[in-house]
């Protein structure tokens, strides 16, 4: 509280959540001065220890705060928030676990768990700018699910039958089913993108990241 009062007294722009705080100034010189003053105040007046490994002077692009990173929007002439690269990597890792082909659960259960992950992640990062990221992650999730579905179909005969049900020509379905290539390669082919497309996966119950983000986004 006293740290907050000090920032207000000195007319410093700051954001604070629990014991995490960002103080914003216009120059590196000002930043170093504020860093010294705040650190001295915390240690000498409050009797607390400042963790210097987590405290630093940096530009907005170099910050990670509560899972967010920052970038400069040249059109809006201001800095904006987005999910930090480490947060994105953590999401991708969890998504990969939920779409593991060797995980012995049904694909509908995988979709259920994916939806929980997607909704929770976007609900948290909804103030960030991430339309392009959501589209990229959407495509990745669909690709991973195609591999799960292709493996579930197992036999060439079953794959031909299911591809034809999804509107694929019989000859193309036969060639695809008997291609002998690895699952990862088959599921990158155009025929698979057509057969198991975004609309069909949504019908199967999958939440589209870009659609959900567009509904939730407060800055769009």
Question: For each predicted feature, which ranges?
Answer:
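Non-catalytic, peripheral interaction segments enriched in hydrophobic/basic residues
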Residues: 110-156, 160-164
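A conserved non-catalytic segment of reverse transcriptases
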Residues: 45-119
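Short, small-residue-biased leader/transition segments that mark boundaries at the very start
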Residues: 1-8
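Catalytic palm subdomain of template-directed nucleic-acid polymerases
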Residues: 12-45, 122, 126-127
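Structural motif
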Residues: 8-9, 65
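Extended C-terminal regions of large enzymes
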Residues: 144, 149, 153-220
